[in-house]
């Protein structure tokens, strides 16, 4: 509802909470590719995008659905480990296209320390695509899914029925949640092998 003669109606995507146009404008001024991370309740997708007068140009992209279809991922599509792997996949494709540097674009996500979106940015840096990020990245244990495995192990011992109910989808896919870190490493190795990249040294 209008609030006076000087009130300016925000653009539709800003009203819908999809785009911060001021942030987008400042990124455009940098003339650097953007490392874009977006997520839904079920999936995450990462794109490396260049600004162009005729419209944004997608240089590389990856969706967490690909992890399942191409690399045998059995975990959740929007879990922290899946975000990392999706970011890694997009970054490797960007590097293959000749991109060496990008600015982070997390949209309207709050820059909370340890947030899932920063797992994708950490993955990019781990494989050699420079994307500036501070000390907000999740720690290595959470990226590997150790928090999921630990909780599952505890729940299995204390309440087997609740364990079966809560992790029903994973168990149906043939993944014991206690094996999340092992499964993460297996899928990560497949992605790196696919792009002929040696296992990167990880940082905490």
Swiss-Prot record:
GO CC terms, sorted: cytosolic large ribosomal subunit
Keywords, sorted A to Z: Ribonucleoprotein, Ribosomal protein, RNA-binding, rRNA-binding
GO BP annotation list: ribosomal large subunit assembly; translation
CDD domains: Ribosomal_L18_L5e
Coiled-coil positions: none
Alphabetical list of NCBIfam families matching this protein: PRK08569.1 (NF006342)
Role this protein plays: This is one of the proteins that bind and probably mediate the attachment of the 5S RNA into the large ribosomal subunit, where it forms part of the central protuberance.
Protein name per Swiss-Prot or TrEMBL: Large ribosomal subunit protein uL18
Species of origin: Ignicoccus hospitalis (strain KIN4/I / DSM 18386 / JCM 14125)
Gene: rpl18
């Amino acid at each position: 509802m209008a609030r006076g003669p000087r009130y300016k109606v925000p653009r539709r995507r800003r009203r819908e909470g999809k785009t911060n146009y001021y942030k987008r404008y400042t990124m455009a001024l940098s003339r650097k590719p953007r490392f874009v991370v977006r997520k839904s309740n079920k999936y995450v997708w990462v794109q490396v995008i260049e600004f162009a007068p005729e419209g944004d140009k997608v240089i590389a992209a990856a969706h967490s659905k690909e992890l399942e279809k191409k690399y045998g991922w059995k975990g959740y599509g929007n879990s922290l480990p899946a975000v990392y792997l999706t970011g890694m996949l997009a970054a490797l494709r960007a590097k293959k296209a000749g991109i060496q540097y990008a600015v982070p674009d997390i949209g309207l996500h709050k820059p909370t320390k340890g947030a899932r979106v920063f797992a994708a940015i950490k993955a990019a840096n781990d494989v050699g695509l420079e994307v500036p990020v501070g000390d907000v990245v999740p720690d290595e244990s959470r990226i590997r899914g150790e928090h999921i495995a630990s909780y599952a192990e505890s729940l299995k011992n204390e309440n087997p029925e609740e364990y079966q109910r809560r992790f029903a989808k994973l168990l149906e896919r043939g993944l014991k949640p206690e094996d999340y870190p092992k499964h993460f490493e297996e899928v990560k190795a497949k992605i790196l092998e696919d792009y002929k990249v040696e296992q990167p040294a990880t940082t905490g």
